[in-house]
Amino acid sequence: MKVKICGITDMETAKRACEYGADALGFVFAESKRKITPGLAKEIIQELPANVLKIGVFVNESVEVIQKITENCGLTHVQLHGDEDNHQIRRLNIPSIKALGVTSEIDMKNAQAYKTDYILFDSPKERFHGGNGKKFSWELLAHMSKELREKTILAGGLNALNIEEAIRTVRPYMVDVSSGVETEGKKDVEKIKQFIIKAKECSK
């Protein structure tokens, strides 16, 4: 099971997450309590292992700005949490992830229209897009096609206590956590370690 730790804001957390086995790290460039500057993101990314995906999170940002930040920071993928359509996705010409809030099985069917490398299924949007720490009904994704499952990233209220059930129900390609590995709003490296251990155990 692949694991993404999202909302990275400092070098120490990034390095420890990689040591514990994270397959991807997320850097939020949209409005969020976990927002990071491109300059700091670049510093961190330059120190990370080559095999770890470096994913930039954007919400309704212009194609030009996304491309510039991607190139300057050394991102491998972009994660789109806004109203981006296939036209914008094609213009980006960058490996991409489309994030969708899930309220019914219709959302799963709509996801298949997006021409992205991955689809991230999350809890419905609130003030901030993603990272709200709220789970949705995983059963809504239990019967997706094999093709969609192989490009599914599951997010939304995941933590070390519920990750086994989430993986067993959805069987995604990757799981994504942010607030579920925090203590008082800050990344907690021990929680990151336990989350990664639990998630990896599920795929043995």
From Swiss-Prot:
Gene3D superfamilies: Aldolase class I. Signal peptide: none annotated. It comes from the Bacteria. GO terms for biological process: L-tryptophan biosynthetic process. It catalyses: N-(5-phospho-beta-D-ribosyl)anthranilate = 1-(2-carboxyphenylamino)-1-deoxy-D-ribulose 5-phosphate. CDD domains: PRAI. Pathway: Amino-acid biosynthesis; L-tryptophan biosynthesis; L-tryptophan from chorismate: step 3/5. It is an enzyme of class 5 (isomerase). Belongs to the TrpF family. This is N-(5'-phosphoribosyl)anthranilate isomerase. It comes from Bacillus cereus (strain Q1).
